[in-house]
Amino acid sequence: VALQWVIQEPEKRDMKTKLAHMIDGMQDDLTGFKQPVKAPKKVNSDYLAMYMMGDHHFGMLADGETKMAGDDADWDVKIATSILLDSTNRLASRVGDAEIGVLLNCGDFFHADSSANTTTKGTPVDVDTRIAKTFKLAGRLFQALINKMLETHKKVVVINVRGNHDSDMACHLSSCIELLYAKEKRVDVLQNYSKFIHYQWHNNLFVFHHGDRMKHEQILQAVIRNLDDEWSQSKNRYCHLGHIHHHTARELGSMHFEHWGSLTATDSWHSSEGYGAERSMTAVVYHKDTGEDSRVKIKVG
């Protein structure tokens, strides 16, 4: 028992440090709890707006000068913060009066999963700053995003899918947001202990997965097997994924699969391998009975 405790202790200290940095960052200069955000006066309970945040790779460092000619976009925590805030603000102003707003992080919000500057599986990556500072700045960013959505929607649901870059960090992120908004009844943070998350709203079933190491057919079978009640109760069935950094859509059986694009610039490795896609963020509006109603897309250069 003593040996096991010694092995686990550094990990526990690391998690406590991350939690402390995020809470400190959220409370430094943001006033969400001291001055609660006022709910909108008029909303339409027939509609839900889902903000699709593709792989954001917060904490990644990309220098345009080191990449393929024409692919010269830089990326660091300041740029990542500015672009995501601007895109979310623009989407919030255009999605209408939907009662519920869902902030969906499709996974890989963080570029690295530990202070070793590696992904969850240990792949080295280029980072902008220390993991503790990255986590602190992420806390500030998420509070700003959620508070903006609280101005537009009566209720905000936060979903953090666990990616292949940030499986552990995504769990810490959800725990911190849940603690911070524990007294705010208008915010609901879904648990992300599993890589599969689902959310049922009236006649709509939403399933979320990062999309790594899992084919659509496998996801469909897992949903039918494990969510049979929710499946039978919902006419409109959607699976939202990230991972591939560009938008694709497919209808398999009676379920719609979509991988969502990303606002992120390419890093030097992906650029050298010829990868790249349109950089965008989309919000989809759903009707409680008939499913998807409309969508708005914001593109960045």
Predicted regions span which residues?
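Core catalytic region of metal-dependent phosphoesterases/phosphodiesterases
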Residues: 37-56, 66-174, 179-185
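Generic structural motif
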Residues: 6-12, 56, 204, 287-289, ...
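Non-catalytic propeptide/linker segments at domain boundaries
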Residues: 1-44
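A generic short-segment signal for beta-strand/edge and adjacent turn/coil regions
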Residues: 15-22, 71-75, 126-129, 166-168, ...
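Conserved beta-sheet core of the metallophosphoesterase superfamily
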Residues: 150, 177-195, 200-300
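Glycine-rich active-site/cofactor-binding loop and its immediate structural neighborhood
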Residues: 60-61
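Short, motif-level signal for alpha-helix interfacial/capping segments enriched in acidic residues
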Residues: 31-41, 87, 219-232
